[in-house]
């Protein structure tokens, strides 16, 4: 992680769970971290978990990644304040409690796609343009899911697996576009199994399933960022021991 000391990381969905763990660990590792979230006060509260030397490196910014105008304003702010972004972690993701074949739920399903897919794409576009403009060999990390590779039968998953399958395809498309452009920017998909987070249905927790913790995924992010410039971890799958899915 030495090469990233003092560099700028943008983390979406930074207010809780995986995003909060990643935000905290990147700041501890010496990066300047811009944590994006709708609940910005919860990102600000993460400073309590940081050593005094790291607290000034964490910047909490209100942003709803389902809104393109929010994304545009945030990346303009990052460019003005810090010069640009070196690492992007697309972590923001939502799951709505409904069925795919339900009724009067079109808005709920669109919210999932707008956040999990379009938010990821639009943030990646802004980060890439920032890296390209400054000739930075940066890194874009997508927090994907095992359901982005295989659809499992669990209640009210609705359009969530489709949104994560999109992330898998988007990762490969980005890799191809970066290669064709002669870019040294890396792109990585990290696909966790079941993680104990706020969006995890209570039925999974109460069912006694094996669970990962948010910190396990954050450690994976640190690992992929710490690889040599010649190494790209394209896909990393992480499951808890004994997972049924």
Curated annotation (Swiss-Prot):
Binding residue positions for substrate: 145
Catalytic activity, EC: 1.1.1.216
GO biological process: juvenile hormone biosynthetic process
Entry-linked InterPro entries: NAD(P)-bd_dom_sf (IPR036291), Sc_DH/Rdtase_CS (IPR020904), SDR_fam (IPR002347)
Tissue: Highly expressed level in the midgut and brain in adult females, and at lower level in the abdominal and thoracic ganglia. High levels are detected in corpora allata (CA), Malpighian tubules and fat body.
Protein keywords: NAD, NADP, Oxidoreductase
Quaternary organization: Homodimer.
Name the UniProt record assigns to this protein: Farnesol dehydrogenase
């Amino acid at each position: 992680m030495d090469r990233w000391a003092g560099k700028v990381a943008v983390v979406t969905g930074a207010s809780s769970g995986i995003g909060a763990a990643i935000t905290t660990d990147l700041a501890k590792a010496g990066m300047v971290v811009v944590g994006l979230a709708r609940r910005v006060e919860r990102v600000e509260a993460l400073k309590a978990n940081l050593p005094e030397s790291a607290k000034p490196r964490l910047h909490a910014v209100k942003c709803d990644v389902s809104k393109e105008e929010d994304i545009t304003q945030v990346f303009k702010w990052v460019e003005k304040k810090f010069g640009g972004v070196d690492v992007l972690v697309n972590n923001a993701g939502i799951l709505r409690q409904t069925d795919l074949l339900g009724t009067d739920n079109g808005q709920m399903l669109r919210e999932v796609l707008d956040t999990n897919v379009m938010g990821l794409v639009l943030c990646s576009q802004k980060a890439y343009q920032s890296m390209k403009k400054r000739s930075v060999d940066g890194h874009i990390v997508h927090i994907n899911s095992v359901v982005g590779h295989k659809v499992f039968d669990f209640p009210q998953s609705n359009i969530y697996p489709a949104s994560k399958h999109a992330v898998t395809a988007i990762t490969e498309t980005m890799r191809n576009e970066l290669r064709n452009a002669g870019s040294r920017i890396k792109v990585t998909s990290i696909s966790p199994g079941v993680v104990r987070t706020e969006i995890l249905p209570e039925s999974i927790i109460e069912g006694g399933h094996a669970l990962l913790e948010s910190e396990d995924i954050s450690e994976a992010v640190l690992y992929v960022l710490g690889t040599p410039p010649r190494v790209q971890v394209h896909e990393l799958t992480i499951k808890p021991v004994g997972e049924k899915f």
